[in-house]
């Protein structure tokens, strides 16, 4: 694997409600150690870490009709899980739709940071990671996936999500070891 071209880590929906709360799944818990170690290495190497967090308005966001209340703005469920140790130099981009880019400041933040490659981590490869990757690709970013730091509700969703990202956006999936060496 070649060095990544001006990378940033995008951490998608690693929130209390997705890992231990209303939309919890064991597969979300399973990626916490790998995500933690990847973020630690990225921070040590000066790679920006950006959290793309669901942050819904109760009673307004139509997504809540499909998924029920989750990640409601101002609640503990909308907070980054403590294991990931959100720090002062990290960035947080709240989102009200699946994509971290849709009507948020993510694109301008990445441009101001000089980012050219986004490393996708978090939940879920077939949903929010997929839509964030799609918009990243359409905006001209290179997209790669941290295969040990992403997951989905089921193995089938995870595998199909990775395959879709590869087929549609050329997003190769790499191990933490490979990614850290490429920072």
Where are these regions (language model features)?
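Short glycine-enriched, charge-decorated loop/helix-capping segments at active-site entrances
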Residues: 22-29, 65-71
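A short alpha/beta connector and helix-capping loop motif
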Residues: 5, 24-55
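Active-site flanking residues adjacent to catalytic metal/cofactor-binding acidic residues
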Residues: 12, 53, 147
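Short active-site segment of divalent metal-dependent hydrolases/proteases
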Residues: 16, 57
